[in-house]
Swiss-Prot record:
GO terms for molecular function: DNA replication origin binding. This is Cell division cycle protein CDT1. Keywords: Cell cycle, Cell division, Cytoplasm, DNA-binding, Mitosis, Nucleus. Associates with the MCM2-7 complex. Interacts with MCM2, ORC1, ORC2 and ORC6. GO terms for biological process: cell division; double-strand break repair via break-induced replication; pre-replicative complex assembly involved in nuclear cell cycle DNA replication; regulation of DNA-templated DNA replication initiation. It comes from the Eukaryota. Signal peptide: none annotated.
Length: 604
């Protein structure tokens, strides 16, 4: 039974294969391609007649026809470009529309022969793909033998043979047996923007099956060297109007991979909604793929794309912050705003990346009133949702929509500026802090003035002292022994003072235990209560008393009560370190007796 289940699981993850020995003409291939594209974005082609010729040409590329490294890489993203790990990229673009000129031609005979064979096959299947999932008759006729654009890409590595699957580190053991080392491949993400991309050898490539989410970092390796691989691009997915979706591939550049991508002419509009032409979309993809080249030829466009990524990040971060703060407000029984460093781990977990304080302050740059960010008495930043009345909540638009509109307005102002475009949203600088009533702001300069006035009063009182206090007396000669004695005496006094403070602090907590016990006694027994909920409830209940306490003191008092009444109050620690308290019955008389015993032990 388990073997059958495993075989079914493997069949689900298998790439669809078109066997040309079974289907060959267009009438037979069209329904097959349509059925594949409704569920997949990758398929293999088996028993291609010229596959042996392609393999021989690919082998010659690795050993004989080396790329011309002296031609450079121009603003059209054509030529030869050195990459990492001794890998070279060779790329050529061709367009039948005379409005766009790509003057660099491919002079490599083997690469040209590969291009001619891949182009005929790729153009045929590109037309099939468009007819399969694109309903517009005008778009179905946009690709033909006289109207097209192509991009030929080749990766070259001198040591590429060491990374081929079958010949990876092959050697012969003393026994005469063959032994092979398996090298770990280094994959890079590859997202075609055209209608279709064809690979002459389905090897050193990984794809994402349709059963996996786009954000899931799970890939399935393809090792079918006797097949050609076809992968649809983002243009076909956009023109299909939801009938077809595509996802990125992962390729190993060190495996000397060659690919051919096919478009309609690059001046073709993507849609009638003013989204630009195919050339704009291709330029954007090339800028993202080669940022170093774009920094030289298209610095402004590169900055705009990076700023777009930053805007996408802050929009997603705002949505997550809304969720976290709303859940935090529901779980807390007091209106005390949470500290920002307490919220960051949960926000980072939901964002699936590390979020720091400056990332939160970027939201205030877009919308300064999005959140109430203040400094508490401990010097920590607190973050809370702004107060809104019910009428405003019902009549105004959602906060997320309001933030998106403000973000778009801020973005348009930045890119409309003639100055150098920033690549990220700057963090908001907090120059003011709110008063305790949240009704007005107190300038830091006023605070400094107030403190300086207080110092002036202190100085005036000090000047009224006698003259002898300002005269330096002559120091008596001292020895090293007396100095050590004074240091030891100072340490003893410091230790005694610290012990006295700790004792008084414990006495203060013991005094507050009665009030906290009354709060617990008023709650429903037999119910679980988190330490966060109880601490915030205790702080809120005692904030109007003579000696209010904080959440830290409340947690220590709860632990002390559980230590005095271990049979009555139980505590359990769940995943993440959160403590949960529960009690069934509480006796005030018994607690009073045990509390007196606890206080007497502290005095002793």
């Amino acid at each position: 039974m388990s073997g059958t289940a495993n075989s079914r699981r493997k069949e689900v993850l298998r790439v669809p294969v078109i066997d040309l020995n079974r289907v060959s003409d267009e009438e037979q291939l069209l329904p097959v391609v349509r059925a594949i594209l409704l569920q997949h974005d990758t398929f293999l082609l088996k028993n291609y007649a010229n596959k042996a010729v392609l393999d021989a040409l690919l082998a010659g590329l690795t050993t004989k026809d080396l790329p011309d490294t002296s031609q450079g890489f121009d603003a059209n993203f054509t030529g030869t470009l050195p990459l990492e790990d001794d890998v070279w990229l060779e790329q050529y673009i061709f367009d039948t529309d005379p409005q766009l000129r790509f003057d660099r031609k491919c002079r490599n005979e083997s690469l040209c022969s590969i291009y001619s064979r891949l182009f005929k096959l790729g153009l045929f299947f590109a037309q099939l793909c468009v007819k399969s999932v694109v309903s517009s008759a005008e778009l179905q006729d946009c690709i033909s033998t006289s109207h097209y654009a192509t991009k030929l890409t080749r990766y070259f590595n001198d040591n590429g043979s060491t990374h081929d699957g079958a010949d990876a580190g092959a050697t012969v053991l003393p026994t005469g047996d063959d032994f092979q080392y398996l090298f770990e491949r280094d994959y890079v993400t590859f997202l075609p923007t055209g209608v279709l991309t064809i690979f002459p050898c389905a090897k050193a490539i990984r794809y994402k099956p349709s059963t996996m989410a786009t954000t899931d970092n799970s890939w399935v390796s393809i090792d079918e060297p006797d097949c050609l691989l076809f992968h649809t691009g983002t243009l076909l997915a956009r023109w299909s109007q939801g009938m077809h979706t595509t996802s990125p591939l992962q390729i190993d550049p060190r495996a000397n991979i060659v690919s051919l991508t096919i478009w309609p002419p690059l001046t073709t509009p993507i849609s009638s909604k003013g989204e630009g032409t195919i050339a704009n979309h291709l330029l954007e993809q090339q800028i993202k793929a080669f940022p170093k080249v774009a920094q030289q030829y298209y610095p402004r466009e590169l900055s705009i794309l990076r700023l777009q990524d930053a805007m996408k990040f802050v929009k997603e971060l705002f949505t997550v912050c809304e969720t976290v703060l709303s859940l935090n407000a529901l779980s807390r029984s007091t209106g005390v705003p949470p500290e920002l460093h307490v919220l960051l781990p949960q926000i980072s977990s939901m964002m699936k990346r590390k979020i720091v304080q400056d990332d939160i302050l970027k939201l205030l740059t877009i919308w300064s009133d999005a959140y109430v960010v203040e400094l508490n008495s401990r010097g920590e930043l607190t973050m809370n949702l702004p107060k809104r009345d019910n009428l405003t909540t019902l009549t105004n638009k959602s906060r997320t929509l309001a933030f998106v509109e403000r973000a778009e307005s801020w973005y348009q102002q930045v890119i409309a500026s003639k100055d150098e475009i920033m690549t990220d949203v700057p963090a908001f600088k907090i120059n003011k802090r709110r008063s305790s009533s949240n009704s007005k702001t107190v300038l830091s300069s006023k605070v400094q003035t107030k403190s300086s006035n207080a110092n002036a009063l202190n100085n005036s009182r000090y000047l009224a002292n006698s003259k002898e206090n300002f005269m330096y007396k002559e120091k008596m000669p001292d020895s090293q022994a007396n100095l050590m004695d004074r240091l030891r005496e100072r340490e003893r006094r410091s230790a005694a003072l610290l012990s006295q403070r700790q004792k008084r602090y414990q006495q203060f907590l013991a005094m507050k235990m009665t009030q906290v016990f009354d709060i617990l006694f008023s709650l429903t027994r037999g119910q679980p209560y988190t330490e966060t909920y109880l601490s915030s409830l205790i702080v809120d209940s005692l904030q109007d008393s003579n000696n209010p306490i904080g959440t830290k003191e409340a947690s220590e008092i709860l632990a002390g009560l559980q230590g005095i009444l271990p049979m009555d109050i139980s505590v359990h620690q769940v995943d993440g370190g959160l403590k949960v308290y529960r009690w069934n019955s509480l006796d005030k008389n018994r607690f009073s007796k045990l509390l007196q015993i606890h206080k007497s032990k502290q005095q002793d």
